[in-house]
């Protein structure tokens, strides 16, 4: 469940900032297949990937994080 929430948020911010999966994966230094697994909720992103994604998207990791329930 948590992986799905992270995946949806990462995908939404990626699209909002105009990145393709290929371009975003390259900027993060990961494969497109790993990014796809994260965005589909099949893989929980590591803390390093979360921070790298926030940096590439020019947002804070807190903004990228799912809201507290």
UniProtKB/Swiss-Prot annotation:
Chain ranges of the HTH cro/C1-type domain: 10-64
Transmembrane feature ranges: none
Disulfide cysteine pairs (residue numbers): none
Pfam assignment, any one: HTH_3
Gene3D superfamilies (alphabetical): lambda repressor-like DNA-binding domains (1.10.260.40)
SUPFAM superfamilies the record matches: lambda repressor-like DNA-binding domains
Any one biological process term the GO annotation gives: regulation of DNA-templated transcription
DNA-binding region: 21-40
Keywords, sorted A to Z: DNA-binding, Transcription, Transcription regulation
A molecular-function term among this protein's GO annotations: DNA binding
UniProt keyword Acyltransferase present: no
Protein name per Swiss-Prot or TrEMBL: Uncharacterized HTH-type transcriptional regulator YazB
Protein's organism: Bacillus subtilis (strain 168)
Protein encoded by which gene: yazB
